[in-house]
């Protein structure tokens, strides 16, 4: 049903966002250590 599809999409989006956040976080940490 529609609910299942929505849940599936929400999970995919959450995973993608988490990946992006991890990348940004890693960049931030590296930049901080470079200072």
Swiss-Prot record:
Chief location bin: secreted
Domain of life: Eukaryota
Keyword check for Secreted: yes
Residue positions where Glutamic acid 1-amide is found in the record: 35
Tissue/organ expression: Expressed by the venom gland.
Gene Ontology cellular component terms for the protein in this record: extracellular region
Subcellular compartments: Secreted
Keyword terms of this UniProt record: Amidation, Antibiotic, Antimicrobial, Cytolysis, Hemolysis, Neurotoxin, Secreted, Toxin
Subunit structure: Monomer. Interacts with CSTX-1 (AC P81694), CSTX-9 (AC P58604), and CSTX-13 (AC P83919).
Family, per entry: Belongs to the cationic peptide 04 (cupiennin) family. 01 subfamily.
Biological role stated in the UniProt entry: Has antimicrobial activity against B.subtilis, E.coli, E.faecalis, P.denitrificans, P.aeruginosa, P.putida, S.aureus, and S.epidermidis. Shows insecticidal and hemolytic activities. Probably acts by disturbing membrane function with its amphipathic structure. Synergistically increases the insecticidal activity of CSTX-1 (AC P81694), CSTX-9 (AC P58604), and CSTX-13 (AC P83919) by up to 65%. Also inhibits the formation of nitric oxide by neuronal nitric oxide synthase.
Protein known as: Cupiennin-1a
């Amino acid at each position: 049903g529609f609910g299942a599809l929505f849940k599936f999409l929400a999970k995919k989006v959450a995973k993608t966002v988490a990946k992006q956040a991890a990348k940004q976080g890693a960049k931030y940490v590296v930049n901080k250590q470079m200072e």
